[in-house]
Curated annotation (Swiss-Prot):
Gene responsible for this protein: argS
UniProt keyword terms in alphabetical order: Aminoacyl-tRNA synthetase, ATP-binding, Cytoplasm, Ligase, Nucleotide-binding, Protein biosynthesis
Example of a GO cellular component annotation carried by this entry: cytoplasm
Protein name: Arginine--tRNA ligase
NCBIfam families: argS
One GO-annotated biological process of the protein: arginyl-tRNA aminoacylation
Catalytic activity: tRNA(Arg) + L-arginine + ATP = L-arginyl-tRNA(Arg) + AMP + diphosphate
Cited InterPro entries: aa-tRNA-synth_I_CS, Arg-tRNA-ligase, Arg-tRNA-synth_N, Arg-tRNA-synth_N_sf, ArgRS_core, DALR_anticod-bd, Rossmann-like_a/b/a_fold, tRNAsynth_Ia_anticodon-bd
Superkingdom: Bacteria
EC number: 6.1.1.19
Subunit structure: Monomer.
Motif annotated as 'HIGH' region, chain positions: 130-140
Locations listed in the record: Cytoplasm
Length: 550
């Protein structure tokens, strides 16, 4: 009996209890929840349904809890149901009913935990979208990990997800990048507002290798040559870094295409039709204050050039015309103002602002020997994705960045995350998987085969704790997807790994010496197989490897 099965049983039972007493069943919540008590002595699961419903139907919650407990005790699979406190019901599940979870996991395999909760959603997930003027910095690296994990997580719940990178190749930052390349190619100092770092010299040399006469061209042609070749080279490096990090995108959209394809003009025309823009001081303004923004925004500057928000408007319109019903933007800590701005832009275009969702990620700091690490050797300024991977590896880098809520700044201790110790969270989880894999190999050598026929033999309290935690995995995925919080998967896996290690220390899985394999060995091996599957499924969502050996 899974937590979902128990919740369904509880709702059915509550409906019958209320109906029998001529009480209003409409008072029942659409979704009934059960929770695992912190204290195991309080049972396997608990519910506060009587507290939710009692006053609505004019019954003392504790009395209603008593009715529910009496009815539940008679239900198949329920070992006991007891009233606690002002109206809680504590439940214990019969081992045979509870242990069905193990068979469900083995049968479902890599699809265990998946659901159709978001099957109707067509989601555009835009993340990283770093300027093509340098390597991806540590903040963008956080989004590369979290965004990719979120995309995988949403997909487990049935959503159609497109991972998109918005390529900012239009604007002043590209002009500064080009000036920096040309200065490096000429052997001149970096311009005052330019980009430093050895990568600039590397790219400048590659531009000259592709077009040896680039510096001899007229100024306009020279700049265009360095722009076209240099931006492509930089973006190729970014794509390779992301791919090596385990993050790939379905779509790359060029900001410049919004301006060259007529998308910006189309968006402006839509705004004019909606009466959402006006002229002032020679510029064209968007009435974003009418839709919740803190001030109106310039769309077309007084010199006739589109402002940055013009591209944002066109890009949102483009996404909606491609059929996405939810557009998630994952932005850096300095973009809080974009939440109201993007929602206002959607409303001004005549769309539902709830089709826009903005996630803001906080800062990431690296620490070595108790001191902050601030300088990248290659970029010359901030720490990059490549720096982090070089220091602790892809798995530890991804896990460390996903493990905390995105609205929390994080410090990554390089010594901790590169250590082979239980204090290293990713090592702790991966070691559990490797230990389970070794157990499977040893079982094969001994001729022990996992069997779900006698799961009723799994009655040890450590077995029950592990099984109940395995049953939580679908709910963890559903809530993590709904809340856009993939860090919940990390915390769950660490908790599950702990339950497994405690089970393994208390319950011998394989026969020893001349002992013949028995049904209990087979049932425990099935439990280990299910645990290994769930850990592998969780790590796959995070984009972290599940090693067979460590």
């Amino acid at each position: 009996m899974t937590p979902a099965d128990l919740a369904d049983l509880l709702r059915t039972t509550a409906t019958a209890v209320l109906t029998e007493r001529d009480l209003d069943t409409a008072a029942l919540p659409a979704t009934v929840t059960v929770e695992r008590p912190r204290n195991p002595e309080h049972g396997d699961y608990a519910t506060n349904l009587a507290l939710q419903v009692g006053k609505k139907v004019g019954v003392n919650p504790r009395e209603l809890a008593g009715w529910l407990a009496e009815a539940l005790t008679a239900a198949a699979g329920i070992a006991s149901a007891e009233v606690a406190g002002p109206g809680f019901v504590n439940l214990r599940i019969e081992a045979a009913a509870q242990n069905v979870i193990v068979g469900d996991i083995i049968t479902s395999a890599e699809r265990y935990g998946h659901s159709a909760a978001l099957a109707e959603r067509n989601i555009n997930l835009e993340f990283v979208s770093a300027n093509p003027t340098g390597p991806i910095h540590i903040g963008g690296t956080r989004w590369a990990a979290v965004g990719d994990a979120l995309g995988r997580l949403l997909a487990t719940q049935g959503a159609a997800v497109v991972r998109e990178y918005y390529f900012n190749d239009h604007g002043a930052q590209i002009d500064r990048f080009v000036s920096s390349l040309i200065a490096a190619a000429k052997g001149e100092p970096t311009p005052e507002d330019g980009y430093a770092g050895s990568y600039i010299g590397d790219i400048a040399a590659q531009v000259l290798a592709k077009d040896p006469g680039a510096l001899e061209l007229p100024d306009g042609e020279m700049r265009e040559t360095f722009r076209a070749i240099g931006v492509d080279l930089m973006f190729d490096h970014i794509k390779i870094s992301l791919h090596d990090f385990g993050t790939d995108f379905d779509v790359f959209t060029h900001e410049d295409s919004m301006h060259t394809s007529g998308r910006v003009e189309e968006a402006i025309a839509r705004l004019r039709e909606n009466g959402a823009i006006y002229e002032k001081d020679g510029a064209t303004w968007l009435r974003t204050t009418d839709f919740g923004d803190d001030k109106d925004r310039v769309v077309i500057k007084s010199d006739g050039a589109p402002a940055y928000i013009a591209g944002d408007l066109a890009y949102f319109l483009d996404k909606r015309q491609r059929g996405f019903d939810l557009c998630i933007y994952m932005l850096g800590a300095d973009h809080h103002g974009y939440i109201a701005r993007l929602k206002a832009a959607a409303a001004a275009l005549g769309d539902d602002p709830d089709t826009v969702e903005v996630m803001i990620g906080q800062m990431v700091n690296l620490v070595r020997d108790g001191q902050p690490v601030r300088m990248s050797k290659r970029a010359g300024t901030v720490i990059t994705l490549d720096d982090l991977v070089e220091a602790i590896g892809v798995d530890a880098a991804r896990y460390s960045l996903i493990r905390s809520s995105v609205d929390t700044p994080i410090d990554i201790d390089l010594a901790l995350w590169s250590s082979a110790s239980n204090e290293n969270p990713v090592y702790y989880v991966q070691y559990a998987h490797a230990r389970l894999s070794a157990l499977a190999r040893n079982a094969a050598d001994l001729g022990v085969v996992a069997d779900t026929a006698r799961l009723d033999l799994l009655t040890h309290d450590k077995e029950g704790t592990l099984i109940r935690n395995l049953g939580e995995f679908p709910r963890v995925l559903e809530s993590a997807a709904a809340l856009r919080e993939p860090h919940r998967v990390c915390r769950y896996l660490e908790d599950l790994a702990g339950d497994y290690h405690r089970f393994y220390d208390s319950c011998r899985v394989l026969p020893q010496g001349d002992e013949a394999p028995g049904s209990l060995h087979q049932a425990r091996l099935a439990l280990c197989q299910a645990t290994r599957q769930v850990i592998a499924n969780g790590l796959a969502i995070l984009g972290v490897s599940a090693p067979e050996r460590m």
